[in-house]
Amino acid sequence: MVIINKKRIQIIMACIFISLFAFSIQMSQTQNNTQRTNSNNNLVETTSTPVSGKTIVIDAGHGVPDEGAQSSTGTTEAETNLKISLKVQNLLEQSGCTVILTRSDENAIYDVDSNTLKQKKISDIRNRVKIGNESSADIFVSIHLNKIPQQQYYGWQCFYKEGNEQSNKLAKSIQENLNKSMQKENNRVAMKIDNIYIIKHVEIPTSIVECGFLSNPEEEKQLLDDNYQNRLAW
């Protein structure tokens, strides 16, 4: 099994963190400079990071028994999604953000009375939506990897719910930061979509982030190349 390089994951999660940071500025610019009263009843200006005090749901897509996409060499989407999500969680928490993970281990979050794979997948996705809607969170970000029959495609793609302006801004923020930091030749823009269950039913600002194509063998080879890793880290 090919293991996604740690430096690559660090770059991905840093870009996502920066994007959430930027989006939080857009959501609440007034929170950058708040006011409080000192003991002499004088107004004192205080500052905090834009994500400080925010609650963000990070959704690592798929999970055993549903591994999601898988490359020809055995790299699984579910495992990589979780690695990225845990690192994003760590960065956000260091900045004073409360992070809710839909899953924190290899397993999907289906109900115990689910028996077939189909039942488990349906239960899992509904539970993810439930977490998002009951969390009172500010943002919901779902981490995924892509795979299609054509092998030539590579790069990032972010999706959001049509007609939801805040989700639109969130997805655009993530897409633009990933393009600038990882693949300047990637000219994709965030896309609206309405046939994904999480996108349709999570009520807070939501974006699905497809972090790359497991179907592209050259992209996967690059993940193991030292020079490419160094360029990403730079």
Predicted regions, residues:
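Catalytic-site microenvironment of enzymes
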Residues: M1-W234
